[in-house]
């Protein structure tokens, strides 16, 4: 059962998050991801993302992240402290799939909404429960205006934990 009384609703500017564009043919990127990450990327569409991770040869998690498909682009949304780990590992496989990786200069906004709130067309569902859901939105033009319904980064992290997600910290990688 979800401890819903502790969930806080609103939006957060995820300043410590990086968006990485995996550039290539749709199927090439899909095949790359299917072979390297822990989620089923065939379930991803314009509004539904996946929480995923990348493991080393021993099966230990190197980093975790979200995968979304935004405006015909495969994006990896990852903590900035872990982006180099992801890039160092995935770069080994890029030439085999004719895919490149590019760090984008986009703002990433996280939303925690109750079930009655409508998801906007530019949002990507990443976590869902009976009471609430979490989405990500890419603000490539830096147009999002902060308002009174802003969440702290700590509230966003707590919401993720309440909903069953564990974010790997840099010191936990590969353990």
Q: Residue locations for each model-derived region?
A:
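Basic, glycine/lysine-rich polyanion-binding surfaces/domains
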Residues: 1-175
